[in-house]
Amino acid sequence: MMTNLFSVFDPSAIFNLSLNWLSTFLGILMIPSIYWLMPSRYNIVWNSILLTLHKEFKTLLGPSGHNGSTFIFISLFSLILFNNFMGLFPYIFTSTSHLTLTLSLALPLWLCFMMYGWINHTQHMFAHLVPQGTPAVLMPFMVCIETISNIIRPGTLAVRLTANMIAGHLLLTLLGNTGPSMSYLLVTFLLTAQIALLVLESAVAMIQSYVFAVLSTLYSSEVN
């Protein structure tokens, strides 16, 4: 039973090549259309969303943030959002439900932030290990806690996104598997529940991509 449930997340292979991972890069095919098609309402809405994110990330980074540093977080948001939505369509591989992708995004970012902070702002990074106003007796204990919480950051970023994607898809799979054994009346309620859950999953897809990008921005602002 558990094998059948989680089989929706299995990467399929053709000629010993995991071609379904290429769905991660399908968004690249949509980029050229921006330059040779007339802007539509969708383009205007998307550009306004990106502009709002740019202003918010700029505020989070503070005055010490470098020019153009928000673009990496906006690109991260766009990549995760697109892949989250792609996974909601039938027969499309959900790449963000695998730690392979989420850890590949979170771990290099965290390592870059840590290397930059410890090399260029060593005293500032040491000061972050002890919160202001901590009694001298608790300082060694707080250093251990802050160090552990700092080390597990990329893991929590990756697991949060992966767990939310897996949970929604498992619920949809469970509801879909019970359909053939139900009467026509109950199938109507089942379809209504699945549509409501699909709307909820769309909201989760947006929220999780936003949370991932915002937390990455906050981690970046701490090393400046």
Curated annotation (Swiss-Prot):
Membrane spanning stretches: 17-37, 72-92, 99-119, 125-145, 170-190, 195-215
Recorded superkingdom: Eukaryota
Return one GO MF term: proton-transporting ATP synthase activity, rotational mechanism
Please provide, in alphabetical order, the Gene Ontology terms of the cellular component aspect for this entry.
Answer: mitochondrial inner membrane; proton-transporting ATP synthase complex
Q: Name one Pfam family in it.
A: ATP-synt_A
Q: Which UniProt keywords apply?
A: ATP synthesis, CF(0), Hydrogen ion transport, Ion transport, Membrane, Mitochondrion, Mitochondrion inner membrane, Transmembrane, Transmembrane helix, Transport
The protein's topology relative to the membrane is: Multi-pass membrane protein
- From the Swiss-Prot or TrEMBL record, state where the protein is found: Mitochondrion inner membrane
Task: Report the principal subcellular site.
Answer: mitochondrion
Similarity comment: Belongs to the ATPase A chain family.
The protein's role, per its UniProt record: Mitochondrial membrane ATP synthase (F(1)F(0) ATP synthase or Complex V) produces ATP from ADP in the presence of a proton gradient across the membrane which is generated by electron transport complexes of the respiratory chain. F-type ATPases consist of two structural domains, F(1) - containing the extramembraneous catalytic core and F(0) - containing the membrane proton channel, linked together by a central stalk and a peripheral stalk. During catalysis, ATP synthesis in the catalytic domain of F(1) is coupled via a rotary mechanism of the central stalk subunits to proton translocation.
Under the subunit heading, UniProt states: F-type ATPases have 2 components, CF(1) - the catalytic core - and CF(0) - the membrane proton channel. CF(1) has five subunits: alpha(3), beta(3), gamma(1), delta(1), epsilon(1). CF(0) has three main subunits: a, b and c.
Which NCBIfam families would you find in this protein's record?
ATP_synt_6_or_A (TIGR01131)
Tell me what this protein is called.
ATP synthase subunit a
Its ancestry begins with:
Eukaryota, Metazoa, Ecdysozoa, Arthropoda, Hexapoda
